[in-house]
Amino acid sequence: MLVLWAGFFNGVMTFTLHQLFPTVVATTKLVIDPLDLAGHLQTLLALRGGTVGNPSEGCAWTGDINGVWQLHHQAEFAPLVHKVSEQATGYLESVGFDRSQVALHLQRCWPVLSDWDQLVGRHHHPNAHLSAVLYLTGDGSGEEGVLRVHAPHQSNELVPGLVAGHGGPISSDHPLNSERWDLAPEVGLLVLFPSRLDHSVLANGDPESLRCSISFDFVITAPEHGNPPEYLAPHPSQWSPCPDLSS
């Protein structure tokens, strides 16, 4: 629980505000060698090939729906994957997980390339538990399109819909009534967040710049050994495929 500030009326403290049930989005900066960075960008452009966007008009090119979702199996990206996986482990510990009681798996890893005026619509990742994005471009200005994280609930607006604005009584972007949080990309910036959170990417507003990032989806299961708790999926090594009954 975070105590934000006390309320005052005529100079007398009347109450204390408690921010409850926080949602944690973590950020950190990774150091990427400039030569490695240039090589990664060249590789990702080659993987994109002649396709400059997804089938939906105005949408950025995303590797997960274009057959490029296993960057974690490419040797070139192994150092980056290792660094991001370390940070993902740190995220779990930061929000109270006992790492000895869970196993963390990297499920998907794909690039997102956004040319001018391309965006990624609001979505979440229902097949993952923890997601991360590592930016390979950006100067922190947000001109190339910010990552927007959408609030799952708006309890403090009290009257449903008021926080949307349109001349309503709630102050715009008040910290206790915000419906979104924006993060501007910059080289080496890593962001981690619960996969269930809705998020989007605003349009790239710089006609001279390519916005490039790598996305990671992690899944949490029980450890390989021992009895798994009923609320946590057993380790994949304990799974068995069912026979194909379609033929």
Q: Which positions does each model-derived feature cover?
A:
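Catalytic core of non-heme Fe(II) oxygenases with the double-stranded beta-helix
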Residues: 112-190, 224
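Short acidic (Asp/Glu) patches
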Residues: 91-95, 106, 111-121
